[in-house]
């Protein structure tokens, strides 16, 4: 009986290990030069940051949380979400942040149609700078 229980437990345990899917390894972003050269004209602007906070809560927070990539929807994604509070992320150009946040790729959705107003897009980037 003990051998049977051990065998069943071993099989169940082994199958449970197979059900876990590791997050996708972080791959480099291929950002076109035209985006890399873009500048945020609203950087540091209090009104833009306030607007950006509202827009971020609507469109970004469910996955990104408060910038660490730990929002309530994050666990359901295959891709590890970028931590936008790190020095490495903050060192990116305005245009790189714009491309990553607005154009997106893979599981990061494209927000160009959902957020058609350029000022609102940059407001989100301005708010993200404060996280």
Task: Tell what function each PLM region has.
Residues 44-47, 51, 55, 96, ...:
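Extracytoplasmic/secreted proteins, especially bacterial periplasmic and envelope-associated proteins
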Residues 90-100, 104:
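Short Fe-S-cluster ligation motifs
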Residues 32, 47, 53-79, 107-110, ...:
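Periplasmic/extracellular electron-transfer cofactor-ligation site
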Residues 25-55:
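Electrostatic cytochrome c docking/interface patches
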Residues 22-24, 75-82, 100-131:
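Axial heme c-ligation environment in periplasmic c-type cytochrome domains
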């Amino acid at each position: 009986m003990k051998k049977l229980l051990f065998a069943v437990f071993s099989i169940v345990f082994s199958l449970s290990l197979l059900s876990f899917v590791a997050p996708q390894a972080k791959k480099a972003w291929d950002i076109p030069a035209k985006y890399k050269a873009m500048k945020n004209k609203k950087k540091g602007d209090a009104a833009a940051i306030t607007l950006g906070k509202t827009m971020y809560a609507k469109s970004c927070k469910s996955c990104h949380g408060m910038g660490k990539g730990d929002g309530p929807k994050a666990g359901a994604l295959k891709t590890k979400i970028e931590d936008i509070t790190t020095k490495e992320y903050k060192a990116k150009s305005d245009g790189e942040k714009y491309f990553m946040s607005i154009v997106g790729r893979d599981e990061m959705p494209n927000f160009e149609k959902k957020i058609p107003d350029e000022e609102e897009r940059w407001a989100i980037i301005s708010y993200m700078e404060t996280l």
